[in-house]
Every structure is written in structure tokens, then in C-alpha cells.
Amino acid sequence: MGNFHATTIFAVHHNGECAMAGDGQVTMGNAVVMKHTARKVRRLFQGKVLAGFAGSVADAFTLFEMFEGKLEEYNGNLQRAAVEMAKQWRGDKMLRQLEAMLIVMDKTTMLLVSGTGEVIEPDDGILAIGSGGNYALSAGRALKQYASEHLTAKQIAKASLEIAGDICVYTNHNIIVEEL
């Protein structure tokens, strides 16, 4: 059986609001859609943190658990938890094999965390990952820049995923949006 992959996650901080959106498609290999309603965006740490994944589903669940443990260990300090998780992820021979990326955010900070040790905070308050990530990122930047006073963070996140879903075959329109 081939690898199962999940696709597009988009996150935005906008006008004091924050939102994260993910589509629901899980694809096996390059040919078969196995699930349309996967939930790839989750609330962690008593609902104060949002986390979303793109990549191998089983690997992502492992990383969610590991990140949640780090959040508990560092009392909700998002940046410290992300850095410590990235160090552990990169430093462990078995964990390095995990194929997933995470976006994590709270009301003030948004970070991309990868297995190669990167913990990146965007300059513009927008991140997107997964096969449709570049499409969602482009759409989100345009929406934030040109329609910012008319749209909420939730509306920008949802619209960015809808545009990615129109373009990327690995992204569907079953969109889950979480807000903080």
C-alpha cells in the first residue's frame, strides 16, 4: 500500500485575528483519493494553540503528539515548544524519517516547523504548506493586501483554501477553519 498524504494548510494573522484552514483530502500515492473529510487542523493546549499538518497522516499524528507534549512541558510557550520539538525531530534518527510539516500558531505567533530543523516565523503573518500551499499563499497575500479592511482572518483563510482547491488536484473544498 502506498503512502497516504494530506495537502494544504493555510494560516493568517490579520487585524488582531488569527485563523488556520485545511482541506479534507487524503490521497494515497498519486492516484487515489482515500478520504474527503480528514481534519488536519487541530486545537491544542486548552484551545489556545492551533496546529495544522501537511504530509504523511501517520507521521503528522506522531508530530501532533510530540508538539502537544512540548507545549505542556513549556507551559504553552509556542516558540520554545516549537524549537525544542524541531531539535528533537532533527536529532533523532527515527524521527528524521517522518514526512510532514506543521504550522503552529497562537494569538501572537505563527511558526512553520519542519523535520530539517527549521522553525520559521513569517514576516507578513501568512504561512501555507502542502501541495496547494503556494496557491493558497499567493491568494492569501493578495487578499490580505488588497481586501484587508473588508475581510476577516477567517474569510481570508477560507478563500485562500478555496482558490488552492480550484487549482491543486490534491486539495479539495471540504475546508475546516479554526480561529483564535
From Swiss-Prot:
Pfam families the UniProt entry points to: Proteasome
A molecular-function term among this protein's GO annotations: threonine-type endopeptidase activity
Activation/inhibition comment: Allosterically activated by HslU binding.
Keywords on record: Allosteric enzyme, Cytoplasm, Hydrolase, Metal-binding, Protease, Sodium, Threonine protease
Family classification: Belongs to the peptidase T1B family. HslV subfamily.
Residues reported in the UniProt entry to bind Na(+): G165, C168, T171
UniProt record, GO biological process: proteolysis involved in protein catabolic process
Subunit structure: A double ring-shaped homohexamer of HslV is capped on each side by a ring-shaped HslU homohexamer. The assembly of the HslU/HslV complex is dependent on binding of ATP.
Subcellular location: Cytoplasm
Entries under Gene3D superfamilies matching the protein: Glutamine Phosphoribosylpyrophosphate, subunit 1, domain 1
UniProt GO cellular component terms: HslUV protease complex; proteasome core complex
UniProt-listed InterPro entries: ATP-dep_Prtase_HsIV_su (IPR022281), Ntn_hydrolases_N (IPR029055), Proteasome_sua/b (IPR001353), Proteasome_suB-type (IPR023333)
Keyword RNA-binding included in the entry's annotation: no
Protein name: ATP-dependent protease subunit HslV
Organism: Bacillus cereus (strain G9842)
Annotated function: Protease subunit of a proteasome-like degradation complex believed to be a general protein degrading machinery.
Major localisation: cytoplasm
EC number: 3.4.25.2
Catalytic activity: ATP-dependent cleavage of peptide bonds with broad specificity
Active-site residues, record numbering mapped to chain: T7
PROSITE patterns: PROTEASOME_BETA_2 (PS51476)
